Amino acid sequence: MATYTKEKDVETALEDDAEARAAMQEVFSNTARWPAGFGGFTADATANINGVEHKGTVTVKGPKEIETDISDEKAKGFLTENLASIAMHRGPRSFEESDGKYKLHFGDDDTHPLGRKLIMGGDGMSSFYRIKDGRIQQINRQTPRFSFSINIEESRKNQDGKFLTHKYSVFYFNPETKGLKDVESYTDEYTRVGEADLPEKRRIINCEEGQIYVSTMTLSNHKLL
């Protein structure tokens, strides 16, 4: 995904909805995360950016603690950006540290194909989700540079019965004109190491200046730290 800085939380007059909070807490508990005290991992890594391949190793300790010995700047940036995103979403944290800190409120009924709209009151990115069957099916956020919508297409359960997202698409929009800027299609594979589901492969198909680009990140020989 395109990188962005999380906007500061804002004041909100929205009242917290107990039903929405309970639904979001269920979603949170259904999502696979690395175990508490997770120290990170190392792995052999291959970055293939539209046919140009670079190999090396990576060390992942957290979203802001990622190292690789690959010197090519484009491949290094590709690995770092995607591993940071995975570490952020899979990293251990409580509900109160994440979505639970906002005023949660339903924004419509339950007739949308992707589920009910759940508004995150107090979030500085005007975020709202759509949730259905105990899962987030859509994420919508706004930044000064672009707005985006993440649409979940397929999820799989790990050996603990928790969900890992397998396929999803991201639509980027111009915040002023609302015109479509870009589309990215993701496919993720995970491998179980100890009590953690670690990234094994990510494929991204996206359009850029009228051309289709395909990039893959492949990790192997994982070792826990």
Question: PLM ranges: what are they?
Answer:
Residues T42-T46, E53-T59, E67, K117, ...:
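Ser/Thr- (and often Asn-) enriched beta-sheet segments in non-cytosolic proteins
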Residues M1-N50, S71-K74, F95-S98:
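N-terminal leader/targeting segments and the immediate start of mature chains
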Residues T5-K6, A22-S29, G40, S98-Y102, ...:
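Short amphipathic alpha-helical surface micro-motifs
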Residues T3-K8, D17-R21, S29, G77-T80, ...:
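A broad, low-specificity signal for short, low-complexity segments enriched in glycine/proline
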Residues K55-F148:
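An acidic-aromatic
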Residues P113-L225:
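Gly/Pro-enriched, hydrophobic low-complexity segments
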Residues G51-E53, G210:
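Residue-level signal for secondary-structure boundary sites
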Residues A2-Y4, I66-T68, I212:
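Hydrophobic transmembrane signal anchors and adjacent membrane-proximal interface regions, especially
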